Amino acid sequence: NDEMGFERGFGALASNEINVYWSGNTDQVKGDVYYLNIPITNNLLGTRLFFIPKGTAKDYENIYTLEDLRKSKKVGGFGRGWSDVTIWKNNNLPYLEKENGNWAAIFTMMAKKTRGIDYFSRGVIEILPEKAAIIDKNNLALEVEPNLIFKYNGDFLIYLNKKNGELNKIIESALLNAQKSGLITKTVEEFWKKDFDELNMKNRRVIIVPN
């Protein structure tokens, strides 16, 4: 999905060029596009870690609550239309919204330390792949903040086009069965165990972000 691009992906689904698109919660849904309210990673998208400029981890050592983050005046960076924007706004947390579809530019903006972005909030299952594919590959002076988890209700969802009625029924039935049987939970725990261990998830401080 990232390779296709957020806005282009929803456009392709709306025009029925593709039949299925997965993404986080968004206000970009319109027309014949709708989503299945079945979280497909057990809220891992809403389990957030921060990318930060190298050498700034000490700035987060005394953050234990949402109020601490608010008082720090640290500014988060987000792509346009992301659900995070509404959540950050409702919690009076400073943020900047990237106005075009190239959300990956936030990495370079943050690395320069001159564009007003202090951290980039990403889902826990996005962190290590993006670190390898973007940060390490481009030798950006960024790192993963080591001690915090910010958690809100949010997950990847399956988006469909209403025009594909029969196919949509098959997809929805399969996802419901996977949810009820515990297959989604089992898959999540097995597939991302190595990432969870590497990111030291069990020993991080959890801060709940209301949404």
Predicted regions and their residues:
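Extracytoplasmic/secreted proteins, especially bacterial periplasmic and envelope-associated proteins
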Residues: R8, S83, I87, A105, ...
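Hydrophobic/proline-rich hinge and linker segments of small-molecule sensing/allosteric domains
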Residues: N37-T65, I158
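Bilobed "Venus flytrap"/periplasmic-binding protein-like clamshell domains
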Residues: I52-N92, A105-I106
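Ligand-binding clefts/hinges and TM-proximal coupling segments of bilobed small-molecule sensing domains
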Residues: G79-N90, L175-N211
